[in-house]
Amino acid sequence: MAYPFELGFQDATSPIMEELLHFHDHTLMIVFLISSLVLYIISLMLTTKLTHTSTMDAQEIETIWTILPAIILILIALPSLRILYMMDEINDPSLTVKTMGHQWYWSYEYTDYEDLNFDSYMIPTSDLNPGELRLLEVDNRVVLPMELPIRMLISSEDVLHSWAVPSLGLKTDAIPGRLNQATLTSTRPGLYYGQCSEICGSNHSFMPIVLELVPLKHFENWSSSML
């Protein structure tokens, strides 16, 4: 989860988020190198009064600054497209959960079970127990099995919402009348927090998301107790 004064991303808990972190580092290094080169050239031009007349109209330089940016864009586009295809790929999910956004709470339905659904509201600050997180705790957590592919079907009953869990690399819009899907896989158990990431009204800040990833045996026990 996020911490105060955090400068980087949350720790990755899914293969997709790990790929996104690597891609971020890759593109950031390219931006750093380009910025350093531009600043060096600017400082060189400002600190010298000499002008190289042959560079004012040189075919070689024009060729270089046409081909080099094209190569850089390809180096950015290829890993980006690879990650996009990975995020869209859903092969034989072990579990499907339908998520509906409301003003201002989430409702969940486990479609593989006959009658397993619930609403998830934020716990008010006055009702929190010691150690619980303000504006992030909910009355009903979404319990899911770890290390298994899970399909999330996401939509909305009223206005635009966005279902987002940063540590899992998830952010999917909840649009009325449209069903979007996302793949979720966690490599380790734990509690993972998110929030609605689309301004949806006066209580937009009070729509937390809490996923509890547990071993498969614990999930089976939980689902049996909920039915």
Curated annotation (Swiss-Prot):
Topological region Mitochondrial matrix: 46-59
Keyword field: Copper, Electron transport, Magnesium, Membrane, Metal-binding, Mitochondrion, Mitochondrion inner membrane, Respiratory chain, Translocase, Transmembrane, Transmembrane helix, Transport
Bilayer topology annotation: Multi-pass membrane protein
Outcome (variant: residue 61 to V): In strain: Isolate MSB 53282/NK 7980
Topology feature Mitochondrial intermembrane, residues: 1-14, 88-227
SUPFAM superfamilies recorded: Cupredoxins, Cytochrome c oxidase subunit II-like, transmembrane region
Chief location category: mitochondrion
Binding sites annotated in the UniProt record for Cu cation A2: 196, 198, 200, 204
Binding of Mg(2+), residues: 198
Co-factor requirement: Cu cation
Keyword Electron transport carried by entry: yes
Subcellular location: Mitochondrion inner membrane
GO molecular function: copper ion binding; cytochrome-c oxidase activity
Catalytic activity: 4 Fe(II)-[cytochrome c] + O2 + 8 H(+)(in) = 4 Fe(III)-[cytochrome c] + 2 H2O + 4 H(+)(out)
Biological processes per GO annotation: ATP synthesis coupled electron transport
Enzyme class: translocase
Cofactor, free-text remark: Binds a dinuclear copper A center per subunit.
Membrane recorded as keyword: yes
Protein EC: 7.1.1.9
Function: Component of the cytochrome c oxidase, the last enzyme in the mitochondrial electron transport chain which drives oxidative phosphorylation. The respiratory chain contains 3 multisubunit complexes succinate dehydrogenase (complex II, CII), ubiquinol-cytochrome c oxidoreductase (cytochrome b-c1 complex, complex III, CIII) and cytochrome c oxidase (complex IV, CIV), that cooperate to transfer electrons derived from NADH and succinate to molecular oxygen, creating an electrochemical gradient over the inner membrane that drives transmembrane transport and the ATP synthase.
Quaternary structure and partners: Component of the cytochrome c oxidase (complex IV, CIV), a multisubunit enzyme composed of 14 subunits. The complex is composed of a catalytic core of 3 subunits MT-CO1, MT-CO2 and MT-CO3, encoded in the mitochondrial DNA, and 11 supernumerary subunits COX4I, COX5A, COX5B, COX6A, COX6B, COX6C, COX7A, COX7B, COX7C, COX8 and NDUFA4, which are encoded in the nuclear genome.
PANTHER family (alphabetical): CYTOCHROME C OXIDASE SUBUNIT 2, CYTOCHROME C OXIDASE, SUBUNIT II
Family to which the UniProt record says this protein belongs: Belongs to the cytochrome c oxidase subunit 2 family.
Protein name (database record): Cytochrome c oxidase subunit 2
Lineage: Eukaryota, Metazoa, Chordata, Craniata, Vertebrata
